[in-house]
Amino acid sequence: MVNDFNEKNGIKKRLLDFFPVVLEGIREILESMQYFPEETEKLLYSIKRNTLGGKNNRGLAVLQSLTSLINRELEEAEFRDAALLGWLIEILQGCFLMADDIMDQSIKRRGLDCWYLVVGVRRAINESQLLEACIPLLIRKYFRNMPYYVDLLDTFREVTFLTELGQQEDLLSSRDGEASLRSFDLMKYDFIITYKTSFYSFYLPIKCALLLSRNSNQKAYDTTIKLSKLLGYYFQVQDDYLDCFGDYTVLGKVGMDIQDNKCTWLVCYAEKFASADQLNLLRAHYGKAGSENIAVIKQLYHELQIPELYHKFEDDMVDSISKEIDLIDESTGLKKCIFTKFFQLIYKRSR
């Protein structure tokens, strides 16, 4: 059996080597519109800067999932189609992150200054929209003659809407003031992470692979949604924990959730278990800028044993996800190994 680490890195190199093809496709679209050459280069640089630099897990997932579904190595045309869709998901991720950094007033992303700090808020907003808008044009350019073309367009549009709906609720729930803290609860949190994270991070790559493999089994799609929600929940709670207790040098970004008044797993449970005095402390310091406020909240989390609760949660989620993977009906064409690989990527991660 091929070593998973070497296999992943070999595929990753091929995926990265393919990215210029995607950029060239965008260039051809812009040239057909007679867009100005100098501005074309600026936009292509923005796309490159805001798409590259991550772990590429979503793009890799399309390639690895398709390989598992057809149970053989990908032919060149199959690799090309899967790599294209993988990069479209990475571009979608890039546009979400650009907007997210503006809304959260973040400083660093993937170890670099956030794009809005480089080019200004107005240009960064418009370029995030351009990243999103180029996706259906690239799908039309490369897949318009395929039988799954409409399904592909529909899937990207739906997932984009669901993700932005989750982002909207995340934004509204983190509005300034004590009232927002009182509105934090696990039901609201579940909604945010289901729509903000699960669909584009887990469901979309696998759905793309299912479409490429010509699998139209509804049960396979339903199972994919169910497991994607579980994986997304686990992934986002990890994100919340790492934002507070992770190592910046490993994460490549500065944690902002406490001062940004975010509805996180940590604050939901802190509210649930806090005494009256602790709740007053939480309301006095949560959502406030300044290292002293952040230190108070982190100390409160320790007093409430939130880190210990997180580690128990992680163990329970590992057990639940493992059991759900074992229940997958492979007669639908879906493969257990697809979700196992996803699970291995995020299992007790540190970034």
UniProtKB/Swiss-Prot annotation:
Its EC number is 2.5.1.-, 2.5.1.1, 2.5.1.29, 2.5.1.10. GO terms for cellular component: cytoplasm; cytosol; endoplasmic reticulum; nucleus. Keywords: Carotenoid biosynthesis, Cytoplasm, Isoprene biosynthesis, Magnesium, Metal-binding, Nucleus, Protein transport, Transferase, Transport. One of its GO terms (biological process) is geranylgeranyl diphosphate biosynthetic process. It comes from the Eukaryota. The keyword tRNA-binding does not apply. Dimethylallyl diphosphate binds at R109, K196, T197, Q236, K253, K262. Mg(2+) 1 binds at D100, D104. Belongs to the FPP/GGPP synthase family. Catalyzes the trans-addition of the 3 molecules of IPP onto DMAPP to form geranylgeranyl pyrophosphate. Required for the membrane attachment of ypt7 and rhb1. May be involved in vesicle trafficking and protein sorting. Required for forespore membrane formation. This is Geranylgeranyl pyrophosphate synthase. It comes from Schizosaccharomyces pombe (strain 972 / ATCC 24843). The lineage of its organism: Eukaryota, Fungi, Dikarya, Ascomycota, Taphrinomycotina.
